[in-house]
């Protein structure tokens, strides 16, 4: 099956593309895009991989599914397109960046600048129907993104996995903590940010670990 995805990932994903579940997922997604408003745009579904080739991955931030309002989703978890107001979770992420490492983040919510430094911004589900949060869950995306994590674990050393909230922590439960750094906290959503996200210092902890393991730090 010919799936347009960045070359360094494709090499490892070819067997995945041939599995029955993935073929069913592709048919489902094609039909959804043909008949409904789906986010992100079709050419942005695999943006996380295009912006962060496998050989450059140093950090993985796990999200749940894309933003479901017009113009927001751009294929990177927590990120929005240029010119779009910052969603509440991203406002809280930027607040923690400032409190943690003293950097005032850009007014832009586009996190490509993180991706290009080796931060894989990976949603568990890569598409969503407009105005319907979670509408494409349990269609096969979760299995695919689990395969992505397994590829990283097999091919990479000393990765920082940032797991915000219960959903991400359950999804990442199989990641071995003796070989990688796993940072867990509450989700940056306004409903939970005060329950352990604020003050968790994930950005400085990430950079400390990257330094310790001989990797270049992220300019958050």
UniProtKB/Swiss-Prot annotation:
**Which GO molecular-function terms appear in the entry?**
uracil DNA N-glycosylase activity
Q: What class of enzyme is it?
A: hydrolase
Q: Which Pfam families match?
A: UDG
Q: What cellular component terms from Gene Ontology apply here?
A: cytoplasm
BP GO terms, sorted: base-excision repair, AP site formation via deaminated base removal
Per UniProt, subcellular location reads as: Cytoplasm
Query: Which CDD domains does this one have?
Result: UDG-F1-like
Which SMART domains does UniProt cross-reference here?
A: UDG, UreE_C
| Enzyme Commission no | 3.2.2.27
* Recorded catalytic activity of this chain's protein: Hydrolyzes single-stranded DNA or mismatched double-stranded DNA and polynucleotides, releasing free uracil
Which SUPFAM superfamilies does this one have? Uracil-DNA glycosylase-like
Alphabetical keyword list = Cytoplasm, DNA damage, DNA repair, Hydrolase
What InterPro entries is this protein classified in?
UDG_fam1, Ura-DNA_Glyclase_AS, Uracil-DNA_glycosylase-like, Uracil-DNA_glycosylase-like_sf
Q: Active-site positions, per UniProt?
A: 65 (proton acceptor)
Q: Where is the signal peptide?
A: none
Q: NCBIfam families recorded for this chain?
A: PRK05254.1-1, PRK05254.1-2, PRK05254.1-4, PRK05254.1-5, ung
What does the function comment of this entry state? Excises uracil residues from the DNA which can arise as a result of misincorporation of dUMP residues by DNA polymerase or due to deamination of cytosine.
In the record, the note on similarity to other proteins reads: Belongs to the uracil-DNA glycosylase (UDG) superfamily. UNG family.
Q: What is this protein called?
A: Uracil-DNA glycosylase
């Amino acid at each position: 099956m010919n799936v347009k995805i960045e070359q360094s990932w494709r090499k490892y994903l070819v067997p995945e593309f041939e599995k029955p579940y993935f073929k069913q997922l592709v048919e489902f997604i094609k039909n959804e895009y043909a008949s409904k408003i789906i986010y992100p745009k079709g050419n942005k579904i695999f943006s996380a991989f295009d912006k962060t080739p496998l050989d450059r991955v140093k950090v993985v931030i796990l999200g749940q599914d894309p933003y479901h309002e017009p113009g927001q989703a751009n294929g990177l978890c927590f990120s929005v397109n240029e010119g779009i107001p910052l969603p509440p979770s991203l406002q809280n992420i930027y607040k923690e960046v400032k409190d943690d490492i003293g950097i005032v983040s850009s007014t832009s919510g586009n996190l490509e600048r993180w991706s290009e430094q080796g931060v894989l911004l990976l949603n568990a589900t890569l598409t969503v129907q407009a105005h319907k949060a979670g509408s494409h869950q349990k269609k096969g995306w979760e299995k695919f993104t689990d395969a992505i994590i397994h590829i990283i674990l097999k091919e990479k050393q000393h990765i920082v996995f940032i797991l915000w909230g219960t959903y991400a922590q359950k999804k990442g439960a199989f990641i071995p903590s003796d070989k990688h750094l796993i940072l867990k906290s509450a989700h940056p959503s306004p409903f939970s940010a005060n329950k352990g996200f604020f003050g968790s210092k994930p950005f400085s902890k990430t950079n400390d670990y990257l330094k310790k393991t001989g990797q270049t730090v992220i300019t958050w």
